[in-house]
C-alpha cells in the first residue's frame, strides 16, 4: 500500500478546498500535519523547495507544502510571498488601500505546491496562476485575501463567487490540476 502524503497545513479551510478540488478519485491519501516551518524570504520557487525539504526531514516521508502569493503589478510583485504578513497587519481594506496612488490595480495570484517523496528527495513543483484585479473588499471574509481579488473575466471577487466556481478557476485549482495529473500518471 502507498504511504499517505503529509499535507502541511494548519488551515482547515485550505484543507477543505484542496480536498474538494482534488476530488474523491485522487490516487493518494492526504493527511493534514501541522508543522511550524520557518518563514523564509526569497523567490517563491526557492521558498517552496526549502520548506518542502524541511518538512520532509521532519515528517520522514512523503510531504506536500503549499505557498500562495498575491502579486500587485504596480508594486512590482509585492506583497508576493509575504502576503500572509501583509494581510495580518493591514487586513483586506489596508491591502486594497496600498494601491490608492496607482492606476494599475492588476494583480496575479500564484499558488505553488511542492512535493517531496521523502527525505533528501528531489522536490517537484506544481504552480498555478490567475490574473485579476484588486478591488475594495467584497463578500465573505473567512478566507484570507479572497474579498479583494477579482479574477479577470468576472465581476465578483473570489469571496463572492460560489465555492464550486472559485474551485474551477483559481490559482490553487490550476496548481492542483498539475499535481493531480502527476499522481494519476505515476499511478498507471
UniProtKB/Swiss-Prot annotation:
SUPFAM superfamilies: ITPase-like. Belongs to the HAM1 NTPase family. It catalyses: ITP + H2O = IMP + diphosphate + H(+); dITP + H2O = dIMP + diphosphate + H(+); XTP + H2O = XMP + diphosphate + H(+). This is Inosine triphosphate pyrophosphatase. Pyrophosphatase that hydrolyzes non-canonical purine nucleotides such as inosine triphosphate (ITP), deoxyinosine triphosphate (dITP) or xanthosine 5'-triphosphate (XTP) to their respective monophosphate derivatives. The enzyme does not distinguish between the deoxy- and ribose forms. Probably excludes non-canonical purines from RNA and DNA precursor pools, thus preventing their incorporation into RNA and DNA and avoiding chromosomal lesions. It is found in: Cytoplasm. Binds 1 divalent metal cation per subunit; can use either Mg(2+) or Mn(2+). GO terms for biological process: deoxyribonucleoside triphosphate catabolic process; nucleotide metabolic process.
Amino acid at each position: 500500500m502507498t504511504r499517505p502524503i503529509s499535507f502541511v497545513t494548519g488551515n482547515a479551510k485550505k484543507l477543505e478546498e484542496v480536498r474538494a478540488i482534488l476530488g474523491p478519485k485522487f490516487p493518494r491519501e492526504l493527511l493534514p500535519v501541522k508543522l511550524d516551518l520557518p518563514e523564509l524570504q526569497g523567490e517563491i520557487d526557492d521558498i517552496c523547495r526549502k520548506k518542502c525539504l524541511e518538512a520532509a526531514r521532519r515528517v520522514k516521508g512523503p510531504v506536500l507544502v503549499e505557498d500562495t502569493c498575491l502579486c500587485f503589478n504596480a508594486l512590482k510583485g509585492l506583497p508576493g510571498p509575504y502576503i500572509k504578513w501583509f494581510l495580518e497587519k493591514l487586513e483586506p481594506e489596508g491591502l486594497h488601500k496600498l494601491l490608492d496612488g496607482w492606476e494599475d490595480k492588476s494583480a496575479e495570484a500564484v499558488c505553488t505546491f511542492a512535493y517531496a517523496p521523502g527525505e533528501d528527495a528531489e522536490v517537484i513543483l506544481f504552480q498555478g496562476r490567475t490574473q485579476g484585479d484588486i478591488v475594495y473588499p467584497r463578500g465573505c471574509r473567512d478566507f484570507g485575501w479572497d474579498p479583494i481579488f477579482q479574477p479577470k473575466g468576472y465581476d465578483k471577487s473570489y469571496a463572492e463567487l460560489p465555492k464550486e466556481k472559485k474551485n474551477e478557476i483559481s490559482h490553487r485549482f490550476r496548481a492542483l490540476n498539475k499535481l493531480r495529473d502527476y499522481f494519476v500518471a505515476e499511478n498507471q
